[in-house]
Amino acid sequence: MTVRVGVIGTGAIGQDHIRRLECKLSGAKVTAVTDVNQDLARKVANTYAKQATVYANDRELIAARDVDAVLVASWGPAHEASVLAALEAGKRVFCEKPLATTADGCMRIVEAEMAHGKRLVQVGFMRRFDSGYLQLKQALEQELVGEPLMVRCIHRNVESAESYTTDMAITDTLIHEIDVLHWLLNDEYQHVRVLYPKKTKHALPHLQDPQLVLLETKKGVIIQAEIFVNCKYGYDIQCEIAGEEGVISLPDVPAVRLCSNGRKGTEVLQDWKKRFEAAYDVELQAFIDDGLKDEPASGPSAWDGYVAAVTADACVKAQESGREESIELPKKPAFYQHSAATPEQV
Ligand SMILES: NC(=O)C1=CN([C@@H]2O[C@H](COP(=O)(O)OP(=O)(O)OC[C@H]3O[C@@H](n4cnc5c(N)ncnc54)[C@H](O)[C@@H]3O)[C@@H](O)[C@H]2O)C=CC1
Ligand SMILES: O=C1[C@@H](O)[C@H](O)[C@@H](O)[C@H](O)[C@H]1O
């Protein structure tokens, strides 16, 4: 059996996912694509999925008889409408982050999915499938460092586009830490503060960069997350967790060590594509496998998308107020209690 996938949005990550569905993963086939830029959609189909039909819009693609599952990789503000339409059609949907740009939008998706009665949505929080983060999770579960006390994270990008704004440091970038850290710590967020250090000369006038986000969990763990999207030297993701009995850190991505011209060192990756390539493969294979087995979606859920959105809203409020803001979430519905399975491969 094959899961026939329709892809909405054929930009950077849409193309990447189409390529992996067609060339790397098993049990899937891209049968449909669409993009508001129809020339791009045609070009991408022609390059990576010659058999795919190019549709004029998301609604036509979702309705297509040869589309079993939908992959949403359009711009964030377009996600909610596509996910809701896919749910209405009773089709599985993998949605890149953010699930929706507002907490209310995420809640509408949660409600639609619960009304449908089966989990169909997986959110593209790929770090939960990254071997390094899985090793951290395992170490915490085995209590190798005892109770976690403090976390230090770094999320650096080489440079940001002109369209990247100060709030996007939260909604577009920190959102990955927001998701992965509460999953790692098995804890909930309580408060947040955002500090603005001296601004880099490499950021455009409208952008505050870097930023320091201080999150406190209900158990009292303090997380210090640096977001620096014009760091210039590379794509750098770090995470260190200090516990009562020791410290664990995210492993470096293995790379050849080169000694040449009087220097010794390794290449620094330049973007998310290579850093999380294996994680994207595993998350999407999990989505396809759930479809092949006709089982409820088991990856990061619509509820996880909602938690991330509520937390991001509080972070943006803290950016604006300069004060500590609280993060309040309703109780997780029973429908989502047994979600977000951890893949076994570490
Ligand atoms: N999980 C991850 O690490 C990453 C996730 N993303 C997420 O993936 C999404 C796409 O990001 P990129 O590929 O970098 O952006 P992009 O700008 O390269 O591509 C987005 C594409 O969506 C199309 N589009 C916009 N609205 C549309 C609509 N209503 N219907 C159909 N097509 C539409 C655009 O024309 C564009 O071609 C974003 O939500 C982003 O946050 C992006 C990069 C990495
Ligand atoms: O999701 C991603 C991008 O959309 C975002 O713009 C980057 O800052 C992140 O590093 C990347 O993982």
Curated annotation (Swiss-Prot):
Set out the biological process GO terms recorded for this chain's protein: inositol catabolic process
Region of interest (Disordered), residue spans: 322-346
Q: What is its EC number?
A: 1.1.1.18, 1.1.1.369
Q: Which reaction does it catalyse?
A: myo-inositol + NAD(+) = scyllo-inosose + NADH + H(+); 1D-chiro-inositol + NAD(+) = scyllo-inosine + NADH + H(+)
For bias kind Basic and acidic residues, which ranges apply?
322-331
Q: In which pathway does it act?
A: Polyol metabolism; myo-inositol degradation into acetyl-CoA; acetyl-CoA from myo-inositol: step 1/7
A Pfam family this protein belongs to?
GFO_IDH_MocA
Alphabetic keyword roster: NAD, Oxidoreductase
Which GO terms of the molecular function aspect are on file?
inositol 2-dehydrogenase (NAD+) activity; nucleotide binding
Q: What's this protein's family per the entry?
A: Belongs to the Gfo/Idh/MocA family.
Role description: Involved in the oxidation of myo-inositol (MI) and D-chiro-inositol (DCI) to 2-keto-myo-inositol (2KMI or 2-inosose) and 1-keto-D-chiro-inositol (1KDCI), respectively.
State the oligomer form and interacting partners. Homotetramer.
Protein name, as recorded:
Inositol 2-dehydrogenase/D-chiro-inositol 3-dehydrogenase
